[in-house]
Amino acid sequence: MKAKKVLSGALAAILLTLTPGVAVCAEEMAGQEQTENTQVLSAQEQENQEKAASYAEKIDTNEISNWPQGPAIYAASGIVMDMNSGAVLYAKKAEEKRYPASITKVLSVLTALQYAKMSDTVVFSEDSISFLQWDDAQIGMKPGEEISMESALYGMLLASANEVSYAVAENVGKQYLNGGYAEFIEEMNRISQELGCTSSNWVNANGLHDDNHYTTAHDMARIAAAAYQNEEFRRLETTLEYKVPPTNLTAEERILDQNHKMLWPENYYYYANAKAGKTGYTDQSKTTLVTMAEGNDMQLAAVVLHTYGVDAYTDTRFMYDYAFTNFERLNLRECETSSDIESQISELR
């Protein structure tokens, strides 16, 4: 070992004496590596600080008198809403506008289901492929390739395929809306508004970042509720694996797996009450998640926006544990007499 150290020292001396350019280059590389490490640490520190600050922010529903106190979460916005009544059981900054990322596809699929049949053919145009970046979620479709609408919707919900989302929007727009992709986006906005979404704007069908593409946790819960009431949507979203049959341009099957970890029984983040959901992520939106669950005779939608990685699952679990512990659906006719109701009315007076 000593011989190696001496040799290394001698070599360094020669480099410094005879080839200063090389020595300087080595120093610059070492400095660059140190700077890069510092930047990585700074990014991690910034994330940790943001998470800590968000975790410390108040929960809006905790401010309601006599309301059960809900848990702190890392997400910037979160909500649990009863999908049948619209009652909000838990809310943290649920009305603030944020980027949804791929949970946009819940609305895209809901829009397509208003018109399309599962047997419809979806044809992939050059436009539906050409915008893709190397790291975008996709299933490798080719221009001119054809799949069924059913396979396409599975591609959107299970694999979060961005080119498939574009192609579905384009094909539904052409076949049913007397237009194309733009008309489908208009219909997404119309349906969103019809559902009571007052703070959302949609400019694409896949959720890739655009400054003008945004929603709120509350609006997203409304959309999730409407989607979950659709039988076809539930069938698609509760599927864990689907095989896209061979196509006119691809001889092999494409195997699609559900991305939502809370739906897989063998996964660490599995949640027995969870029935359906959609994941999302962009650099700007950070992690987003929508989850539909059932329990205590309730159907609930949970949404978290702008959180980090698996925090989306732990946040959702905490919110659902809180909701199922503190709330249940009751039949007022069975629980109250007329005198109870009259007494409550007199108190309100």
Briefly describe each language-model feature range.
Residues 2-25:
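Sec-dependent N-terminal signal peptides of Gram-positive bacterial secreted proteins and lipoproteins
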Residues 3-6, 106, 295:
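Hydrophobic alpha-helical segments, especially transmembrane helices
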Residues 197-198, 211-349:
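Domain-terminus/edge residues, biased toward the C-terminal soluble/receptor-binding domains
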Residues 17-18, 118, 331-334:
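Residues in and immediately flanking transmembrane alpha helices
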Residues 25-218, 227-231:
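Active-site-adjacent loops and short helices of periplasmic peptidoglycan-processing enzymes
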